[in-house]
Protein backbone atom coordinates (compact mmCIF):
# COMPACT_ATOMS: atom_id res chain seq x y z
CA UNK A 1 0.00 0.00 0.00
CA UNK A 2 1.28 3.48 -0.85
CA UNK A 3 2.52 5.99 1.70
CA UNK A 4 -0.37 8.27 0.71
CA UNK A 5 -2.87 5.58 1.57
CA UNK A 6 -1.34 4.86 4.97
CA UNK A 7 -0.49 8.41 5.99
CA UNK A 8 -1.96 9.63 9.24
CA UNK A 9 -4.35 12.47 8.65
CA UNK A 10 -3.42 15.71 10.36
CA UNK A 11 -5.37 16.91 13.33
CA UNK A 12 -5.32 20.33 14.90
CA UNK A 13 -3.60 20.68 18.27
CA UNK A 14 -6.11 20.41 21.10
CA UNK A 15 -5.37 23.99 22.19
CA UNK A 16 -6.07 25.44 18.76
CA UNK A 17 -9.46 27.12 18.26
CA UNK A 18 -11.94 25.13 16.21
CA UNK A 19 -12.30 26.09 12.58
CA UNK A 20 -15.57 27.37 11.16
CA UNK A 21 -16.43 24.02 9.57
CA UNK A 22 -15.76 22.26 12.87
CA UNK A 23 -17.92 24.69 14.82
CA UNK A 24 -20.75 24.35 12.34
CA UNK A 25 -20.52 20.57 12.44
CA UNK A 26 -20.61 20.54 16.24
CA UNK A 27 -23.71 22.75 16.21
CA UNK A 28 -25.45 20.47 13.71
CA UNK A 29 -24.81 17.39 15.84
CA UNK A 30 -25.97 19.13 19.03
CA UNK A 31 -29.22 20.19 17.38
CA UNK A 32 -30.05 16.82 15.81
CA UNK A 33 -32.82 15.93 18.27
CA UNK A 34 -34.26 19.44 18.57
CA UNK A 35 -37.31 19.97 16.37
CA UNK A 36 -39.16 23.25 17.05
CA UNK A 37 -42.86 22.74 16.35
CA UNK A 38 -43.18 25.90 14.27
CA UNK A 39 -40.22 24.86 12.11
CA UNK A 40 -41.67 21.37 11.66
CA UNK A 41 -44.96 22.81 10.42
CA UNK A 42 -43.12 25.11 8.02
CA UNK A 43 -41.16 22.16 6.67
CA UNK A 44 -44.38 20.30 5.86
CA UNK A 45 -45.50 23.26 3.76
CA UNK A 46 -42.08 23.37 2.08
CA UNK A 47 -42.44 19.71 1.16
CA UNK A 48 -45.97 20.11 -0.19
CA UNK A 49 -44.89 23.13 -2.24
CA UNK A 50 -41.87 21.26 -3.61
CA UNK A 51 -44.01 18.30 -4.66
CA UNK A 52 -46.56 20.62 -6.29
CA UNK A 53 -43.81 22.20 -8.39
CA UNK A 54 -42.23 18.86 -9.29
CA UNK A 55 -45.55 17.36 -10.38
CA UNK A 56 -46.46 20.35 -12.52
CA UNK A 57 -43.02 20.60 -14.13
CA UNK A 58 -42.18 16.92 -14.60
CA UNK A 59 -43.12 16.91 -18.30
CA UNK A 60 -41.21 20.08 -19.20
CA UNK A 61 -38.15 19.62 -21.45
CA UNK A 62 -35.50 20.20 -18.77
CA UNK A 63 -37.24 17.82 -16.37
CA UNK A 64 -37.51 15.18 -19.09
CA UNK A 65 -33.84 15.57 -19.92
CA UNK A 66 -32.87 15.01 -16.29
CA UNK A 67 -35.06 11.91 -16.19
CA UNK A 68 -33.59 10.51 -19.39
CA UNK A 69 -30.04 10.39 -18.06
CA UNK A 70 -31.16 8.39 -15.02
CA UNK A 71 -30.60 4.62 -14.99
CA UNK A 72 -34.03 3.04 -14.67
CA UNK A 73 -34.30 -0.16 -12.66
CA UNK A 74 -30.92 0.34 -11.01
CA UNK A 75 -32.00 1.71 -7.65
CA UNK A 76 -34.76 2.17 -5.11
CA UNK A 77 -35.45 5.87 -5.53
CA UNK A 78 -38.40 7.36 -7.39
CA UNK A 79 -38.62 10.35 -9.69
CA UNK A 80 -41.78 12.37 -9.08
CA UNK A 81 -44.53 11.77 -11.63
CA UNK A 82 -42.78 8.87 -13.38
CA UNK A 83 -42.58 5.07 -13.03
CA UNK A 84 -38.78 5.21 -12.83
CA UNK A 85 -36.81 3.46 -10.07
CA UNK A 86 -33.28 4.79 -10.08
CA UNK A 87 -30.14 5.21 -7.93
CA UNK A 88 -30.43 7.92 -5.31
CA UNK A 89 -28.06 10.39 -7.05
CA UNK A 90 -30.13 10.16 -10.25
CA UNK A 91 -33.37 10.74 -8.35
CA UNK A 92 -31.85 13.66 -6.47
CA UNK A 93 -30.77 15.33 -9.70
CA UNK A 94 -34.05 14.76 -11.56
CA UNK A 95 -36.33 15.74 -8.69
CA UNK A 96 -34.32 18.86 -7.99
CA UNK A 97 -34.55 19.91 -11.64
CA UNK A 98 -38.31 19.29 -11.69
CA UNK A 99 -38.79 21.15 -8.42
CA UNK A 100 -37.03 24.11 -10.02
CA UNK A 101 -38.77 23.68 -13.35
CA UNK A 102 -41.50 26.32 -12.96
CA UNK A 103 -39.31 28.97 -11.31
CA UNK A 104 -41.85 28.82 -8.46
CA UNK A 105 -39.76 27.07 -5.81
CA UNK A 106 -39.43 28.26 -2.21
CA UNK A 107 -37.20 31.26 -1.62
CA UNK A 108 -34.76 32.20 1.14
CA UNK A 109 -34.18 35.90 0.52
CA UNK A 110 -31.18 36.34 2.82
CA UNK A 111 -29.13 33.83 0.84
CA UNK A 112 -30.87 34.56 -2.49
CA UNK A 113 -31.20 30.78 -2.70
CA UNK A 114 -33.80 28.11 -3.25
CA UNK A 115 -32.99 25.71 -0.44
CA UNK A 116 -35.96 23.34 -0.71
CA UNK A 117 -34.99 22.10 -4.15
CA UNK A 118 -31.55 21.01 -2.92
CA UNK A 119 -32.38 19.78 0.59
CA UNK A 120 -35.63 17.89 0.03
CA UNK A 121 -34.66 15.71 -2.98
CA UNK A 122 -31.62 14.45 -1.07
CA UNK A 123 -33.57 13.51 2.05
CA UNK A 124 -36.41 11.93 0.08
CA UNK A 125 -33.96 9.74 -1.84
CA UNK A 126 -32.18 8.66 1.34
CA UNK A 127 -35.54 7.83 2.91
CA UNK A 128 -36.13 5.36 0.08
CA UNK A 129 -32.79 3.63 0.62
CA UNK A 130 -33.37 3.04 4.31
CA UNK A 131 -36.49 3.46 6.44
CA UNK A 132 -36.56 6.90 8.04
CA UNK A 133 -39.07 8.27 10.51
CA UNK A 134 -40.69 11.64 10.03
CA UNK A 135 -39.14 13.34 13.01
CA UNK A 136 -35.61 12.49 11.85
CA UNK A 137 -36.47 13.67 8.34
CA UNK A 138 -37.79 16.99 9.63
CA UNK A 139 -34.75 17.56 11.86
CA UNK A 140 -32.42 16.90 8.93
CA UNK A 141 -34.34 19.26 6.65
CA UNK A 142 -34.30 22.02 9.25
CA UNK A 143 -30.52 21.58 9.54
CA UNK A 144 -30.14 21.83 5.77
CA UNK A 145 -32.15 25.04 5.57
CA UNK A 146 -30.23 26.43 8.54
CA UNK A 147 -26.81 25.80 7.06
CA UNK A 148 -27.76 27.00 3.58
CA UNK A 149 -29.42 30.12 4.94
CA UNK A 150 -26.69 31.14 7.39
CA UNK A 151 -23.87 30.34 4.99
CA UNK A 152 -25.62 32.28 2.24
CA UNK A 153 -26.11 35.32 4.44
CA UNK A 154 -22.34 35.30 5.03
CA UNK A 155 -21.42 34.96 1.37
CA UNK A 156 -24.03 36.34 -1.00
CA UNK A 157 -24.15 40.03 -1.95
CA UNK A 158 -25.80 41.73 -4.94
CA UNK A 159 -22.41 41.98 -6.64
CA UNK A 160 -21.70 38.29 -6.00
CA UNK A 161 -25.13 37.26 -7.32
CA UNK A 162 -24.59 39.30 -10.47
CA UNK A 163 -21.90 36.81 -11.48
CA UNK A 164 -22.31 33.61 -9.48
CA UNK A 165 -25.42 31.49 -8.84
CA UNK A 166 -26.31 31.68 -5.13
CA UNK A 167 -28.12 28.31 -5.05
CA UNK A 168 -25.12 26.70 -6.71
CA UNK A 169 -22.89 27.96 -3.91
CA UNK A 170 -25.20 27.51 -0.91
CA UNK A 171 -26.89 24.34 -2.12
CA UNK A 172 -24.13 21.73 -1.81
CA UNK A 173 -23.44 22.60 1.82
CA UNK A 174 -27.15 22.72 2.69
CA UNK A 175 -27.66 19.30 1.13
CA UNK A 176 -24.54 17.86 2.78
CA UNK A 177 -25.65 19.12 6.19
CA UNK A 178 -29.11 17.64 5.74
CA UNK A 179 -27.76 14.28 4.60
CA UNK A 180 -25.19 14.13 7.40
CA UNK A 181 -27.91 14.79 9.95
CA UNK A 182 -30.23 12.13 8.58
CA UNK A 183 -27.39 9.61 8.34
CA UNK A 184 -26.50 10.18 12.00
CA UNK A 185 -22.94 11.36 11.44
CA UNK A 186 -20.78 12.49 14.33
CA UNK A 187 -19.11 15.90 14.33
CA UNK A 188 -15.98 14.74 12.48
CA UNK A 189 -17.86 13.12 9.61
CA UNK A 190 -20.20 16.09 9.43
CA UNK A 191 -17.27 18.48 9.22
CA UNK A 192 -15.73 16.40 6.46
CA UNK A 193 -19.03 16.48 4.56
CA UNK A 194 -19.28 20.26 4.89
CA UNK A 195 -15.67 20.75 3.84
CA UNK A 196 -15.96 18.45 0.85
CA UNK A 197 -19.17 20.15 -0.25
CA UNK A 198 -17.39 23.52 -0.12
CA UNK A 199 -15.29 22.24 -3.01
CA UNK A 200 -18.34 21.24 -5.05
CA UNK A 201 -19.92 24.65 -5.55
CA UNK A 202 -20.58 25.89 -9.07
CA UNK A 203 -22.72 28.08 -11.26
CA UNK A 204 -22.33 31.35 -13.13
CA UNK A 205 -25.20 33.72 -13.83
CA UNK A 206 -24.72 34.13 -17.56
CA UNK A 207 -27.84 32.08 -18.37
CA UNK A 208 -30.43 34.77 -17.45
CA UNK A 209 -29.34 36.97 -20.33
CA UNK A 210 -30.69 34.47 -22.85
CA UNK A 211 -32.94 32.31 -20.68
CA UNK A 212 -30.66 29.30 -21.06
CA UNK A 213 -31.24 26.02 -19.24
CA UNK A 214 -28.22 26.03 -16.92
CA UNK A 215 -30.39 27.41 -14.12
CA UNK A 216 -32.44 24.23 -13.77
CA UNK A 217 -29.44 21.92 -13.82
CA UNK A 218 -27.35 24.00 -11.41
CA UNK A 219 -29.83 23.15 -8.67
CA UNK A 220 -29.70 19.46 -9.56
CA UNK A 221 -25.92 19.43 -9.46
CA UNK A 222 -25.86 21.28 -6.15
CA UNK A 223 -28.20 18.74 -4.58
CA UNK A 224 -26.37 15.74 -6.01
CA UNK A 225 -22.98 17.16 -5.04
CA UNK A 226 -24.15 17.64 -1.46
CA UNK A 227 -25.22 14.00 -1.30
CA UNK A 228 -21.90 12.93 -2.81
CA UNK A 229 -19.96 14.94 -0.24
CA UNK A 230 -21.91 13.37 2.62
CA UNK A 231 -21.44 9.86 1.29
CA UNK A 232 -17.73 10.35 0.78
CA UNK A 233 -17.43 11.62 4.34
CA UNK A 234 -19.30 8.55 5.55
CA UNK A 235 -16.71 6.39 3.81
CA UNK A 236 -13.86 8.17 5.54
CA UNK A 237 -12.98 10.89 3.04
CA UNK A 238 -11.15 13.78 4.67
CA UNK A 239 -12.09 17.39 4.02
CA UNK A 240 -9.86 20.26 5.11
CA UNK A 241 -10.95 21.72 8.43
CA UNK A 242 -10.28 25.16 6.98
CA UNK A 243 -12.20 24.63 3.75
CA UNK A 244 -14.38 27.62 4.66
CA UNK A 245 -12.10 29.99 6.54
CA UNK A 246 -8.55 29.10 5.55
CA UNK A 247 -6.40 31.36 3.39
CA UNK A 248 -7.93 29.69 0.32
CA UNK A 249 -11.20 28.74 1.97
CA UNK A 250 -14.53 29.26 0.25
CA UNK A 251 -15.58 32.34 2.22
CA UNK A 252 -12.10 33.81 2.20
CA UNK A 253 -11.80 33.37 -1.54
CA UNK A 254 -15.17 34.76 -2.61
CA UNK A 255 -16.03 37.46 -0.09
CA UNK A 256 -14.92 40.95 -1.22
CA UNK A 257 -13.02 41.54 2.03
CA UNK A 258 -11.40 38.08 1.83
CA UNK A 259 -12.34 37.43 5.44
CA UNK A 260 -14.48 34.62 6.81
CA UNK A 261 -17.07 35.80 9.33
CA UNK A 262 -18.29 33.54 12.08
CA UNK A 263 -21.44 31.60 11.27
CA UNK A 264 -23.56 30.72 14.28
CA UNK A 265 -26.11 28.04 13.54
CA UNK A 266 -29.39 27.67 15.43
CA UNK A 267 -28.80 31.02 17.10
CA UNK A 268 -32.18 32.75 17.04
CA UNK A 269 -35.09 32.11 14.71
CA UNK A 270 -34.62 29.03 12.49
CA UNK A 271 -33.69 29.98 8.94
CA UNK A 272 -36.49 27.85 7.53
CA UNK A 273 -38.94 30.37 8.96
CA UNK A 274 -37.43 33.02 6.67
CA UNK A 275 -38.42 31.04 3.59
CA UNK A 276 -41.40 32.28 1.59
CA UNK A 277 -43.46 30.65 -1.13
CA UNK A 278 -43.74 32.35 -4.48
CA UNK A 279 -47.20 33.47 -5.57
CA UNK A 280 -46.08 33.68 -9.21
CA UNK A 281 -43.85 31.42 -11.34
CA UNK A 282 -41.20 34.09 -11.88
CA UNK A 283 -37.83 35.16 -10.53
CA UNK A 284 -37.72 36.14 -6.88
CA UNK A 285 -36.89 39.73 -7.77
CA UNK A 286 -39.88 40.00 -10.11
CA UNK A 287 -42.32 38.84 -7.43
CA UNK A 288 -43.04 42.08 -5.57
CA UNK A 289 -43.01 44.35 -8.65
CA UNK A 290 -45.52 42.07 -10.36
CA UNK A 291 -47.69 41.96 -7.23
CA UNK A 292 -47.65 45.75 -6.96
CA UNK A 293 -48.58 46.03 -10.64
CA UNK A 294 -51.33 43.46 -10.17
CA UNK A 295 -52.79 45.32 -7.21
CA UNK A 296 -52.71 48.55 -9.20
CA UNK A 297 -54.37 46.94 -12.23
CA UNK A 298 -57.14 45.47 -10.07
CA UNK A 299 -57.77 48.78 -8.30
CA UNK A 300 -57.67 51.08 -11.33
CA UNK A 301 -58.88 50.99 -14.93
CA UNK A 302 -55.71 51.12 -17.01
CA UNK A 303 -55.96 51.22 -20.79
CA UNK A 304 -52.58 49.94 -22.07
CA UNK A 305 -52.86 52.26 -25.08
CA UNK A 306 -52.98 55.24 -22.71
CA UNK A 307 -49.79 54.29 -20.85
CA UNK A 308 -46.88 56.65 -21.39
CA UNK A 309 -44.38 55.03 -19.03
CA UNK A 310 -44.11 52.61 -16.11
CA UNK A 311 -41.55 52.89 -13.34
CA UNK A 312 -40.73 49.91 -11.13
CA UNK A 313 -38.84 50.99 -8.02
CA UNK A 314 -36.97 48.03 -6.60
CA UNK A 315 -34.03 47.06 -4.42
CA UNK A 316 -30.47 47.32 -5.64
CA UNK A 317 -30.31 43.52 -5.55
CA UNK A 318 -33.32 43.24 -7.86
CA UNK A 319 -32.00 45.64 -10.46
CA UNK A 320 -28.53 44.09 -10.37
CA UNK A 321 -29.59 40.46 -10.70
CA UNK A 322 -28.94 39.25 -14.25
CA UNK A 323 -31.97 39.18 -16.50
CA UNK A 324 -34.24 41.14 -14.17
CA UNK A 325 -33.72 44.60 -15.68
CA UNK A 326 -34.52 43.52 -19.22
CA UNK A 327 -37.33 44.81 -21.46
CA UNK A 328 -37.10 42.29 -24.29
CA UNK A 329 -37.31 40.87 -26.85
CA UNK A 330 -37.88 37.42 -25.35
CA UNK A 331 -36.95 34.25 -27.18
CA UNK A 332 -37.22 31.76 -24.29
CA UNK A 333 -39.64 31.30 -21.40
CA UNK A 334 -36.96 31.52 -18.73
CA UNK A 335 -35.72 34.79 -20.19
CA UNK A 336 -39.22 36.23 -19.73
CA UNK A 337 -39.64 34.75 -16.25
CA UNK A 338 -36.53 36.57 -15.09
CA UNK A 339 -37.72 39.95 -16.39
CA UNK A 340 -39.31 42.53 -14.08
CA UNK A 341 -40.51 44.36 -17.20
CA UNK A 342 -42.36 41.34 -18.57
CA UNK A 343 -43.99 40.47 -15.24
CA UNK A 344 -45.17 44.03 -14.60
CA UNK A 345 -46.52 44.36 -18.15
CA UNK A 346 -48.33 41.03 -17.92
CA UNK A 347 -49.89 41.96 -14.59
CA UNK A 348 -51.25 45.22 -15.99
CA UNK A 349 -52.37 43.72 -19.30
CA UNK A 350 -53.82 40.39 -18.10
CA UNK A 351 -54.45 41.13 -14.42
CA UNK A 352 -52.75 37.88 -13.52
CA UNK A 353 -49.33 36.21 -13.46
CA UNK A 354 -49.40 32.48 -14.13
CA UNK A 355 -48.01 29.88 -16.52
CA UNK A 356 -50.38 31.11 -19.23
CA UNK A 357 -48.67 34.50 -19.03
CA UNK A 358 -45.60 32.94 -20.63
CA UNK A 359 -47.17 31.02 -23.51
CA UNK A 360 -47.01 33.83 -26.06
CA UNK A 361 -43.70 35.61 -25.79
CA UNK A 362 -44.39 37.51 -29.02
CA UNK A 363 -47.62 39.18 -27.84
CA UNK A 364 -47.31 42.66 -29.41
CA UNK A 365 -49.38 44.39 -26.73
CA UNK A 366 -47.34 42.86 -23.93
CA UNK A 367 -44.02 43.62 -25.59
CA UNK A 368 -45.06 47.22 -26.19
CA UNK A 369 -45.99 47.62 -22.54
CA UNK A 370 -42.82 45.90 -21.30
CA UNK A 371 -40.76 48.34 -23.37
CA UNK A 372 -42.28 51.20 -21.38
CA UNK A 373 -41.09 49.80 -18.03
CA UNK A 374 -38.03 51.28 -16.34
CA UNK A 375 -36.49 49.70 -13.25
CA UNK A 376 -35.05 52.14 -10.71
CA UNK A 377 -33.27 51.52 -7.41
CA UNK A 378 -35.16 52.73 -4.34
CA UNK A 379 -32.83 53.50 -1.42
CA UNK A 380 -35.50 52.89 1.21
CA UNK A 381 -36.42 49.49 -0.19
CA UNK A 382 -32.74 48.61 -0.52
CA UNK A 383 -32.09 49.48 3.13
CA UNK A 384 -34.88 47.13 4.21
CA UNK A 385 -33.56 44.23 2.08
CA UNK A 386 -33.23 41.27 2.67
CA UNK A 387 -35.47 41.33 5.74
CA UNK A 388 -38.12 42.84 3.50
CA UNK A 389 -38.41 42.76 -0.25
CA UNK A 390 -40.53 45.68 -1.37
CA UNK A 391 -41.33 47.37 -4.67
CA UNK A 392 -43.35 50.26 -6.05
CA UNK A 393 -44.93 50.50 -9.49
CA UNK A 394 -46.04 53.83 -10.98
CA UNK A 395 -47.95 54.14 -14.25
CA UNK A 396 -48.01 57.50 -16.03
CA UNK A 397 -50.96 57.99 -18.41
CA UNK A 398 -51.47 60.28 -21.39
CA UNK A 399 -54.01 62.35 -19.44
CA UNK A 400 -51.24 63.36 -17.03
CA UNK A 401 -52.23 61.12 -14.13
CA UNK A 402 -49.73 58.88 -12.35
CA UNK A 403 -51.11 55.80 -10.61
CA UNK A 404 -48.92 54.11 -8.01
CA UNK A 405 -48.92 51.11 -5.71
CA UNK A 406 -46.17 50.38 -3.17
CA UNK A 407 -45.63 47.15 -1.30
CA UNK A 408 -43.13 47.18 1.55
CA UNK A 409 -42.66 43.42 1.28
CA UNK A 410 -43.51 40.49 -0.94
CA UNK A 411 -46.91 38.89 -0.37
CA UNK A 412 -46.17 35.16 -0.26
CA UNK A 413 -48.43 32.41 -1.48
CA UNK A 414 -50.62 31.31 1.42
CA UNK A 415 -51.31 27.73 2.45
CA UNK A 416 -54.69 27.49 0.66
CA UNK A 417 -53.02 28.51 -2.61
CA UNK A 418 -50.18 26.05 -2.08
CA UNK A 419 -52.65 23.26 -1.39
CA UNK A 420 -54.74 24.16 -4.43
CA UNK A 421 -51.68 24.11 -6.67
CA UNK A 422 -50.64 20.76 -5.21
CA UNK A 423 -54.10 19.24 -5.60
CA UNK A 424 -54.34 20.30 -9.24
CA UNK A 425 -50.87 19.16 -10.27
CA UNK A 426 -50.81 15.92 -8.28
CA UNK A 427 -54.35 14.91 -9.25
CA UNK A 428 -53.57 15.37 -12.93
CA UNK A 429 -50.54 13.08 -12.62
CA UNK A 430 -51.45 10.37 -10.08
CA UNK A 431 -55.21 10.79 -9.72
CA UNK A 432 -57.31 12.62 -7.15
CA UNK A 433 -57.54 9.78 -4.63
CA UNK A 434 -53.81 9.19 -4.54
CA UNK A 435 -53.15 12.93 -4.43
CA UNK A 436 -55.32 13.18 -1.30
CA UNK A 437 -53.42 10.26 0.24
CA UNK A 438 -50.13 11.97 -0.53
CA UNK A 439 -51.28 15.27 0.99
CA UNK A 440 -52.36 13.41 4.12
CA UNK A 441 -48.95 11.72 4.30
CA UNK A 442 -47.23 15.10 4.17
CA UNK A 443 -49.59 16.52 6.80
CA UNK A 444 -48.74 13.58 9.06
CA UNK A 445 -45.01 13.68 8.33
CA UNK A 446 -44.03 14.17 11.98
CA UNK A 447 -45.91 10.97 12.90
CA UNK A 448 -44.63 8.88 9.99
CA UNK A 449 -42.56 5.78 10.58
CA UNK A 450 -41.56 5.51 6.92
CA UNK A 451 -41.04 8.72 4.96
CA UNK A 452 -40.16 6.68 1.88
CA UNK A 453 -43.88 6.00 1.49
CA UNK A 454 -44.30 9.60 0.37
CA UNK A 455 -42.14 9.10 -2.69
CA UNK A 456 -43.79 5.79 -3.52
CA UNK A 457 -47.07 7.66 -3.76
CA UNK A 458 -45.60 9.99 -6.40
CA UNK A 459 -45.04 7.13 -8.86
CA UNK A 460 -47.10 6.60 -11.98
CA UNK A 461 -47.91 3.19 -13.41
CA UNK A 462 -46.50 4.05 -16.80
CA UNK A 463 -44.61 6.84 -18.48
CA UNK A 464 -46.86 9.91 -18.61
Predicted regions span which residues?
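Short, well-structured alpha-helical segments that form the helix of a local strand-helix-strand
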Residues: 141, 145, 191-194, 438-439
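Well-ordered alpha-helical segments within folded domains of soluble proteins
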Residues: 116-124, 171-178, 223-227, 286-288, ...
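Flexible glycine/proline-rich, aromatic-decorated loop/lid segments
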Residues: 196-204
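Hydrophobic alpha-helical hairpins/lids featuring a short glycine-rich hinge
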Residues: 98-155
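Active-site cavity-forming subdomains of large catalytic enzyme subunits
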Residues: 130-136, 153-163, 176-193, 206-216, ...
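Terminal-appendage/accessory-domain detector
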Residues: 1-112, 209, 214-224, 231-464
Amino acid sequence: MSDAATAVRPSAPSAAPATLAERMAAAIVRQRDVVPAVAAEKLKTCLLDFLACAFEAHTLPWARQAQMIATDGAGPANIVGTPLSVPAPDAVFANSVAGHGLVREDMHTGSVSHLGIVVLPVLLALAEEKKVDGRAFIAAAIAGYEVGGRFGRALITPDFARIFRPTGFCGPMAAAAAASTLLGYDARKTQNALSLSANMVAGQNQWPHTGADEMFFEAGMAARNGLTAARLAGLGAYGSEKALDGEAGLLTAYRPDHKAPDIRLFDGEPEILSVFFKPAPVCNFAQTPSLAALALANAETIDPDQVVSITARVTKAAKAYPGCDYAGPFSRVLQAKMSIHYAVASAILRKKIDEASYRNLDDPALLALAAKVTAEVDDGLTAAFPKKQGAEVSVTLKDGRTLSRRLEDVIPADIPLIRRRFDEAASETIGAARARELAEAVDGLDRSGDVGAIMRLTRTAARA
